[in-house]
């Protein structure tokens, strides 16, 4: 981290707060090195008090934000919502709630994020319990949630950045054939509605965490591999729109990857 913190073109580290010990360790590192680190919170890990709480220390979004503020003297922690969207809280899937109810819950969760000082919101519409999602439906849901969150931020005179997903974690890199069309439509909508265009795109790599290891081709990637070629095309597409690429679930990948 020391070596890279002053580099302009480098990979940023995002950490999921899987436990209070993990959160405290991140706070210790950011304080010692005086570097920014992003904490990315799934709705299962940390959830708004309006809907209950998360499994991490039973924290609500509101409580977690206050805890970080009380410990982060140099304001190095960047709070980010990870996988915000319909049915992204496991209780919603378990109870098989309707689309209207999960859509309302998603909005409540995002409002608490905004009120709690989150800087990045991940808009993830990739789950639907009752229908197979077309790319156009996912685009539509991304656009609507970006507009909703943007409007809520404007009411509060705040700003957030958006991350977007079109495929679930672990989806094949072959899905990127739709990517340029999708990003173009989302950017057009944002520009037409005075919404800041997304800053991050969670790219499909086929990579996912299984138990205590990574599955997928990312763990054996090299310059001659097919996945390297596919990911290079994906990254070039993102560069065309000046949107940063983000890879999820890299916990156990080797340094070479």
Region spans (language model):
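Short secondary-structure junction motifs
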Residues: 34-36, 74, 157-161, 198
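Membrane-interface helix-loop-helix junctions at boundaries between adjacent transmembrane segments
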Residues: 98-104, 127-139
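Active-site capping/gating regions of soluble enzymes
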Residues: 14, 107, 111-114, 119, ...
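Alpha/beta catalytic barrel-like cores
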Residues: 1-81, 88, 95-104, 109-110, ...
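Short amphipathic alpha-helical segments, especially helix-boundary/capping motifs
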Residues: 1-4, 41-42, 124-125, 157-162, ...
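Aromatic-lined carbohydrate-binding surfaces of glycoside hydrolases
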Residues: 83-91, 121-132, 155-162, 171-176
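Active-site-proximal loop/turn and secondary-structure-junction residues that shape catalytic pockets
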Residues: 19-21, 43-45, 83-87, 125-129, ...
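Short hydrophobic alpha-helical runs that function as membrane-insertion/retention elements
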Residues: 38-39, 121-123, 245-246
């Amino acid at each position: 981290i020391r070596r890279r913190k002053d580099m302009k073109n480098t990979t940023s580290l995002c950490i999921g707060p899987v436990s209070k010990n993990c959160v405290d360790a991140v706070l210790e590192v950011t304080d010692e090195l005086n570097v920014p680190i992003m904490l990315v919170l799934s709705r299962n890990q940390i959830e708004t008090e309006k809907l209950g709480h998360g499994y991490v220390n039973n924290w609500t979004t509101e409580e977690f934000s206050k805890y970080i503020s009380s410990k982060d003297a140099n304001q190095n922690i960047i709070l980010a919502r990870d996988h915000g969207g319909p049915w992204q809280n496991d209780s919603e899937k378990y109870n098989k709630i309707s689309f209207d109810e999960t859509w309302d819950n998603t909005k409540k969760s995002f409002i608490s994020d905004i009120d709690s000082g989150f800087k990045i919101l991940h808009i993830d519409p990739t789950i639907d319990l009752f229908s197979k999602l077309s790319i156009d439906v996912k685009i539509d849901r991304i656009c609507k949630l970006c507009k909703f969150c943007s409007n809520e931020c404007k009411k509060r005179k705040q700003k957030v950045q958006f991350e977007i997903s079109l495929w679930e974690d672990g989806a094949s890199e072959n899905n990127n054939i739709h990517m340029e069309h999708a990003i173009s439509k989302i950017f057009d909508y944002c520009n037409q509605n005075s919404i800041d265009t997304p800053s991050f795109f969670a790219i499909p790599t086929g990579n996912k965490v299984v138990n205590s290891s990574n599955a997928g081709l990312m763990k054996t990637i090299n310059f001659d591999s097919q996945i390297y070629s596919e990911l290079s095309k994906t990254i070039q597409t993102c560069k065309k729109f000046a949107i940063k690429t983000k890879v999820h679930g890299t916990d156990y990948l080797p340094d070479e990857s």
